[in-house]
Amino acid sequence: MASLLCCGPKLAACGIVLSAWGVIMLIMLGIFFNVHSAVLIEDVPFTEKDFENGPQNIYNLYEQVSYNCFIAAGLYLLLGGFSFCQVRLNKRKEYMVR
């Protein structure tokens, strides 16, 4: 029978910690981009043409970056779930007798 175990216990625990931090950080960044934080203007991919029609184009770019942050947070959440499954499989492996 094929085993789904592909990570050791330390790597799985590290994956959980990094995923938790990534989810928290990216959700906060997504919220800050969604409220159009002026501090994050350097991270918005705008051109000179975007400044011609008022702030609405810049606001749309802020929201696009915000959605990208939320999507990345979702991917980190999936990675954290995978790492959690690996931790559970490693614990189950400890109790199995060969």
Curated annotation (Swiss-Prot):
Enzyme class (EC, first level) = hydrolase
Q: Which residues cross the membrane?
A: 13-33, 65-85
List localization entries.
Endomembrane system; Cytoplasmic vesicle, Clathrin-coated vesicle membrane
Q: Which InterPro entries match?
A: Ribonucl_Kappa, RNase_K
Q: Which domain of life, per UniProt?
A: Eukaryota
Q: How does it sit in the membrane?
A: Multi-pass membrane protein
Q: Does the keyword ATP-binding apply?
A: no
Q: Which GO terms describe its molecular function?
A: RNA endonuclease activity
Plastid keyword on record = no
Its GO CC terms are: clathrin-coated vesicle membrane; endomembrane system; vacuolar proton-transporting V-type ATPase, V0 domain
Q: Name one GO biological process term.
A: receptor-mediated endocytosis of virus by host cell
- What are its E.C. numbers? 3.1.-.-
Question: Which keywords does the record carry?
Answer: Cytoplasmic vesicle, Endocytosis, Endonuclease, Hydrogen ion transport, Hydrolase, Ion transport, Membrane, Nuclease, Transmembrane, Transmembrane helix, Transport
What the entry lists under Pfam families is as follows: V-ATPase_su_f
What does the UniProt record say this protein does?
Answer: Endoribonuclease which preferentially cleaves ApU and ApG phosphodiester bonds. Hydrolyzes UpU bonds at a lower rate. Regulates the activity of vacuolar (H+)-ATPase (V-ATPase) which is responsible for acidifying and maintaining the pH of intracellular compartments. Required at an early stage of receptor-mediated endocytosis.
So what family is this one in?
Belongs to the RNase K family.
Quaternary structure note: Interacts with the proton translocation complex V0 of the V-ATPase. Interacts with ATP6AP1.
Its name, as the record gives it, is: Ribonuclease kappa
Q: Which organism is it from?
A: Mus musculus
Give the encoding gene's name.
Rnasek
